[in-house]
Amino acid sequence: ITVYRNGTSFALTLKRERITAPTVDSGIIEDTIGYIILSEFTPQTGNQLLEHVQKLMKQGIVGLIIDERNNSGGAVDGAMQSANIFLEEGKTLVTIQGKKGTMRDQRYISTGKAEVPANLPIVILTNTGSASSAEIFAAAMKDNGRATLIGTKTFGKGIVQDVFRFGSGFAQVTTAHYYTPNGENIHKLGIEPDILVEDVQLSDEEIPAFEQLMTDKVISTFVQENPEPSEANIRRFASLYTERGIDEEVLTLLVRNEYLSKMPYDKRPIADATFDKQLNRAVEFIRTGK
């Protein structure tokens, strides 16, 4: 390719390479609890997840939290391979039911031996941003009694769509639906959590106040003037600006996220339960079993 920069043009030769993007990250929180983020599902996610699980197990974890919040899905095979890590052989993972006359129903089952002891408690965090393959994984774990879901109901995207040539263009046609091991249709219904913990989010009434807060650069200015990301500073910011018409919990998350964005990536905590209600509830469940 030819690149034009600062008045000068020059040629570059680019070589394509296959890149395997990591979709799994992990760490230890609360001293003894394993925490895994699943950002999406690819064909490599199952292997990546297994490596992280094995690493955490060697550190003597007493429970595992898998965070699927805002995981929009991806490769269905990746979701099924991931569920295989935790389920014994012969468990239903998902069933695909086609429209009459389009395809035969297909049931997928777990294969091999579970890599994680059956007595290790597992929590999966979900919200409305958890969709498609993320829902397949969550449902397989929930319906087979291997994980407790905490958070809010998932998005509800569970269909198979095929693309056909149609005239001078193309048409996308739904040919099948995904069903959970318990026979529930995922599409437009989503997966209900076992324990409901609502997301902290802006209400419609708070949006104008939030926009003004950003326009005035209130958050970034506060962080610049108070660079220590301490709990005291975060709570002080929230208490100072509730008069702007934004809930204190929302303000807490906004300034915490600003502090995190200023940290070097390798210095950021894998998770912060201090101001995360859903994660806090997951930790409580791991500790108490209820």
Language model feature labels by segment:
Residues 1-25, 174-175:
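PDZ-domain C-terminal substructure recognizer with occasional recognition of PDZ-binding tails
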Residues 25-65, 70-290:
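C-terminal "post-core" interaction segments
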